[in-house]
Amino acid sequence: MDITIYLSLLFLGVYLAGLAVRRWIFLRDKRLMKSEIRSGGRAVAKIDELEPGCVKKFWLICQKYRIDAFLVNDQGQFHAYVNRCRHMATPLDFIRDQFLSEDGRYLMCYTHGALYEFANGMCVEGPCKGEALYRLPVRVDGDEVLVGCPEGDLKALAD
């Protein structure tokens, strides 16, 4: 067999295998999501799991799009935001799972240094000053924190 044909078939096989794996992961994740969804959103944390000033990453499937997000405990009040800096739409945690400024008082974009307030997601310092993170609806149900999907066109917020 000619080496060109062999390599073409090999690359085609690898490509198709990659598609199959991605499809399987998406369907598996979608099944997991369905089991965790209830009226009002997806349970993303237990109340006692997240201490004040702590942040937890999670994701949602909203209108067929995967939305990467995070939950922050602001002195017992929970807030959830899409994990996208308003400056360049990069994840805030460029350094894995690092969302807080050094003093722990602000959410921080580690790509551009933008600082955001916990309570309203407003950028108070940096290139996006005056803009707010995309907020997600949050409610507490018993001992769980539920986060719902935002309204509107979500294509720009998805990965």
Set out the residue ranges of the language-model regions.
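Short cysteine clusters
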Residues: 85, 109-112
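Short cysteine/histidine-rich metal-coordination sites, predominantly Zn2+-binding motifs
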Residues: 99-109, 123-133
